[in-house]
A protein has these predicted regions:
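N-terminal Lys/Arg-rich, disordered targeting/topogenic segments
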Residues: 1-12
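Hydrophobic membrane-insertion alpha-helices, especially the h-region
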Residues: 14-31
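Membrane-interface motif at the C-terminal end of an N-terminal transmembrane signal
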Residues: 27-41
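Surface-exposed, glycine-biased beta-strand/turn segments
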Residues: 37-172, 181-185, 213, 222
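Zn2+-dependent peptidoglycan hydrolase active-site motif and core
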Residues: 154-204, 229-234
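Acidic, glycine-rich catalytic/binding loops that coordinate metals and/or anionic ligands
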Residues: 182-186, 206, 212, 234-247
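Active-site loop architecture of trypsin-fold serine endopeptidases
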Residues: 220-234, 238
């Protein structure tokens, strides 16, 4: 028996109809998928933090290095006598212009200055020399000499953008995003800043976590490329390509 052949025109029509259906089905699937993503994004709330209400110091208690004995220099935070602990000294760029050689050890009139110079071992944009001053190098942060295990605090309300635990570079470090903060250059303008805390011994927060000003976020250490316990404290603006930024 001879099979019936499909006329060429009907055959062409069936192929065209099938292609049309396939294209439509593909487009429809894509449309549904995209709209589902948009709906999902609109349902998930955007993470925000409390508005700016001032700042706090990243370190609340630090040793009076000028009063420590040689043996006490290497003690952890919890082992240093409380009588030799105090508030973090003020950061004053002019202090770095005074050389250590001009400061007589044991002179009570220069005790605070000596302690400040020891505490801020590397100033902003300084180098690693003993008497480094600002803008003598390319260090984009302030190194704060503190014992291992010193509590570290968020300087302002923000969102943890990075909570890295690593053995190289910055070591264990945290980056916090601070939105709508007054600009350092013009307090009438608002911008986004990123504060970073590096070489930590312990990271106590997770990425995406909302933190408040003065909330403890970690413990200081000497992880990464650090050669002694300290806090690498850095602030970057929103134009930095990455955080913490390094040239």
């Amino acid at each position: 028996m001879r099979k019936n052949k499909i006329p060429p025109r009907k055959k062409w029509f069936k192929v065209t109809a099938w292609l049309t259906f396939t294209v439509f089905a593909t487009f429809f699937s894509y449309f549904v998928e995209q709209n589902a993503s948009l709906m999902k994004a609109s349902i998930i709330p955007t993470v925000t933090h409390e508005p700016f209400d001032g700042t706090a110091l990243p370190i609340q208690k630090a040793p009076d290095w000028s009063s420590l004995t040689t043996e006490e220099y290497n003690l952890s935070y919890s082992s240093i006598p409380s009588s030799k602990m105090g508030s973090l000294p003020s950061y004053n760029p002019s202090d770095f212009e005074t050389s250590f050689s001009s400061l007589k050890w044991g002179d009570p009139s220069t005790k605070d200055l000596r302690n400040a110079k020891i505490t801020y071992s590397v100033p902003y944009m300084g180098n690693y020399s003993l008497d480094s001053v600002e803008y003598s190098g390319s260090h984009l942060a302030v190194d704060i000499k503190i014992p291992k295990g010193t509590p570290v605090f968020a300087i302002g309300n923000g969102i943890v953008k990075k909570a890295s635990r690593q053995s190289t570079g910055f070591g264990n470090h945290i980056v916090i995003e601070h939105n709508n903060f007054p600009s350092i250059d013009n307090k009438d303008n608002f911008t986004t800043y990123y504060s970073s805390y590096s070489h930590l011994d312990s990271v106590l927060v997770e990425e995406g976590q909302v933190v408040r000003k003065g909330e403890q976020i970690g413990l200081s250490g000497e992880t990464g490329t650090a050669t002694t316990p300290h806090l690498h404290f850095q602030i970057d603006n929103d134009n930095a390509s990455w955080h913490p930024y390094w040239p």
